[in-house]
């Protein structure tokens, strides 16, 4: 039995598809209100803030995937994320299950250096500090050695379905709504974005590769690294629109935070959009040379095909 904690998000949905397709016939989906991806999926309603519920949800699992998310609310991140993670780790230990942790890059420096698995944590802002503390806790569990632990880390998303990211919200959702795509802060910095189905496929590969445990892995991304201007052009072309976009300058996004709680919550991330974001996934590609990374144009065309 392989179990996904936080089973309703886009990463978890694609992960469930990949696990069922390639790795296991027994799949359990855990969240407060889980929904089946396949008819044969086992649903386990549970609140990960409750340690007893987490233990019950994980019991009998061989591999546990932590893909749980929260709304971009600093208070929720500070008060709930650490508890959810700790309960998930304790439940996995009680079950003797392997633990695969899906991570982001909020703990990294917000500058133009090439990010590798060895880049030291230097979080900017409260959400970055939360994610740094969570990643450090998982590394502690990895070093403890009671259960096998692996970390799969992804940069900013773009993707199909209900993918949630700044890029999806400003570029892709704008095009879906018939508006000009918007890009945050600057359009001339290089971006590394990950196609969400690739992230899920890669996490499944790590979880089912015994030699992957005990390490952190950057999940595989296309190395073309377009600027936001180039990405917006590709997105417009995929949607059959004349290439054009607007830039939301930093002062505009900062001002928006005075009136919008959602805009206020992303202000700590704005420095990363002033710099190139260079995310290196060489380690994964060398270990899994047959893994096919989705090119940006192919991903954008897939999004267009699913759009009404």
Explain the meaning of each model-derived region.
Residues 2, 202-265, 281, 292-308:
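Mid/C-terminal beta-alpha module of Rossmann-like enzyme folds, strongest
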């Amino acid at each position: 039995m392989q179990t996904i904690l936080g089973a309703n998000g886009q990463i978890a949905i694609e992960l469930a598809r990949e696990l069922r397709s390639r790795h296991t016939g027994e799949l359990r989906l855990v969240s407060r209100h889980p929904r089946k991806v396949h008819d044969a999926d086992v649903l386990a309603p549970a609140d990960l803030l409750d340690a007893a519920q987490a233990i019950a949800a994980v019991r009998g699992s061989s591999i546990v995937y932590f893909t749980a998310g929260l709304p971009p609310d600093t208070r929720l991140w500070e008060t709930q994320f650490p508890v959810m993670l700790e309960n998930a780790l304790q439940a996995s230990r009680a079950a003797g299950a392997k633990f695969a942790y899906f991570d982001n890059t909020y703990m990294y420096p917000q500058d133009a250096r090439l990010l590798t698995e060895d880049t030291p944590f230097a979080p900017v802002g409260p959400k970055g500090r939360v994610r740094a503390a969570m990643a450090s806790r998982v590394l502690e569990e990895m070093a403890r050695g009671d259960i096998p632990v692996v970390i799969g880390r992804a940069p900013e998303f773009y993707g199909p379905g209900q993918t949630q990211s700044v890029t999806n919200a400003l570029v892709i959702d704008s095009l879906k709504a018939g508006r000009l795509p918007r890009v945050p802060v600057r359009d001339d910095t290089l971006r590394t974005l990950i196609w969400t189905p690739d992230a899920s496929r890669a996490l499944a590969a790590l979880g089912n590769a015994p030699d992957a445990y005990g390490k952190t892995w950057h999940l595989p991304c296309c190395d073309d690294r377009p600027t936001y201007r180039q990405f917006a052009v590709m997105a417009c072309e995929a949607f059959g629109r004349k290439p054009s976009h607007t830039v939301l300058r930093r002062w505009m996004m900062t001002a928006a935070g005075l009136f919008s709680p959602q805009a206020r919550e992303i202000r700590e991330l704005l420095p990363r959009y002033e710099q190139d974001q260079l995310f290196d996934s060489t380690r994964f590609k060398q270990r899994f040379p047959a893994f096919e990374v989705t090119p940006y144009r192919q991903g954008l065309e897939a999004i267009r095909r699913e759009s009404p």
